[in-house]
Amino acid sequence: FLSCSGKSGLESGIPKVSLVIDGTFDDKSFNESALNGVKKLKEEFEIELVLKESSTNSYLSDLEGLKDAGSNLIWLIGYKFSDVAKAVSLQNSEMKYAIIDPVYSNEPIPANLVGMTFRAQEGAFLTGYIAAKVSKTGKIGFLGGIEGDIVDAFRYGYEAGAKYANKDIKIFSQYIGSFSDLEAGRSVATKMYSDGIDIIHHAAGLGGIGAIEVAKELGSGHYIIGVDEDQSYLAPNNVITSTTKDVGRSLNLLTSNYLKTNTFEGGKLINYGLKEGVVGFVRNPKMIPFEVEKEIDSLSSKIINKEVIVPYNKESYEKFLKEFI
């Protein structure tokens, strides 16, 4: 039970850690990264792991079920859980909750809830820079899932990095309104490639997997940038790099500390970026010229030292263009 010290009920029995996602675990990016993070915990700790694929209409009932089944810590993966995470935390003060990518403004966060946010724009800035340097057509694309704070960070970071590399680069960005529509991803990617775009950065879940499939089918000259994890294994000749957001590592760090110390640092948001080694890009000497990788290393240092402030939305992007381009 929650006490003033933040101690939690790990004193008796095998701890039970639950992982709740919206969608499926085999999305080859975001949810799968979270799953890999908790699986690594089982190598180090004796825990019971509960995995739950949920959907909007069943969030509350699923979370009640996990609470009643004795979960010590419940992880909620993705911004769609933002509202329900606060609601259940307030209702069940003895429980521990953690959420990845919550969308909270300056509102207070319950003491038994911790949120993890990411400066994904910093990694996307680097891959945008790469795209602009590597593109042969001078036209690159961005394929997003659902428009909003989380995907916008990827989009505007990517666009800013591309413009930083080449102010004349042409960028075409489009959202498909879903993270689970493979066919929509295929359709938009096909159109982009036919319009002369030769590199697409996706942040569209299964839609992005569809885009990778299209790049692979079209072959040489059709390239893609993966997201969250290294996705090069899906199309080794077409995936130039991936903008990484190590959800699994961040989840693992917090849960390990909780299991080792029996303390829970709730009531706040933890923010990770390039500096913490949680976001970044995948090196690929086969497709990224050595001199470009050297430029990226220098650029990373500038971002970490705040010499370059990477935009994360439309407003900050427009400000960035005035300052740096």
Curated annotation (Swiss-Prot):
The keyword Ubl conjugation does not apply. A lipid is attached at residue 4 (S-diacylglycerol cysteine). Monomer. The keyword Transmembrane does not apply. It comes from the Bacteria. One of its GO terms (cellular component) is plasma membrane. Keywords: Cell inner membrane, Cell membrane, Lipoprotein, Membrane, Palmitate, Signal, Transport. The gene is bmpA. A lipid is attached at residue 4 (N-palmitoyl cysteine). Changing residue 111 to S: In strain: PLe. It is found in: Cell inner membrane. This is Basic membrane protein A. Belongs to the BMP lipoprotein family. Residues 1-3 form the signal peptide. Its main location: membrane. It comes from Borreliella afzelii. Immunogenic protein. May be part of an ABC-type nucleoside uptake system involved in the purine salvage pathway.
